[in-house]
């Protein structure tokens, strides 16, 4: 996991890597789309045959996976090789600002623009269910290795506000200040 994160941080688009760090360290609003609204969207789409959704959900056991199976474009090819987190974040934010009835009616058509894997990840990130077994410490260690800095300095610099912009890594790479050295425990 660590080596994969190191490689990603070193090679990915800077904005994408910043958004990934934000998501992996739990710094973002996790539940932009409430699971109850996601279920309502499915029930509305299935209308009189909502029992079919219930059966699918019971068989699959995961709401995001069920919705991805039912509504994603099954013929779409995943575009995950391209930077997508920023685009998804903008979509999530736009959807979260909608009235519930608009969100409920638009969600199935939005999911149909994504591949099954993309829809699954989009829903997991949007509903707060994104868990990958990566601790904050592992992310901090990967960043430290990626830019060849002390992990304690990285952790201290990430304690405050984190702005997931393209310059995030450059700010972390800045030379260590005397204040940072003085604050480091002996």
Regions found by a protein language model. Give the residues of each.
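N-terminal nucleic-acid-engaging modules of covalent nucleotidyltransferase systems
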Residues: 1-186
């Amino acid at each position: 996991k660590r080596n994969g994160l190191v490689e990603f941080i070193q090679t990915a688009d800077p904005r994408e890597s910043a958004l990934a760090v934000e998501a992996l360290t739990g710094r973002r609003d996790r539940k932009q789309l409430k699971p109850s609204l996601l279920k309502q969207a499915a029930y509305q789409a299935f209308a009189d045959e909502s029992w079919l959704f219930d059966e699918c959900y019971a068989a699959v056991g995961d709401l995001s996976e069920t919705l991805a199976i039912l509504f994603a474009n099954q013929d779409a090819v995943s575009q995950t090789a391209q930077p997508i987190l920023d685009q998804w974040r903008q979509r999530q934010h736009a959807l979260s600002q909608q009235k519930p009835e608009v969100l409920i009616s638009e969600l199935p058509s939005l999911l149909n623009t994504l591949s099954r894997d993309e829809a699954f990840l989009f829903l997991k990130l949007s509903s707060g269910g994104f868990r990958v077994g990566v601790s904050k410490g592992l992310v901090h260690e990967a960043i430290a290795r990626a830019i060849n800095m002390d992990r304690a300095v990285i952790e201290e610099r990430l304690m405050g506000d984190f702005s997931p912009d393209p310059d995030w890594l450059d700010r972390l790479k800045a030379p260590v200040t005397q204040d940072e050295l003085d604050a480091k425990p002996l």
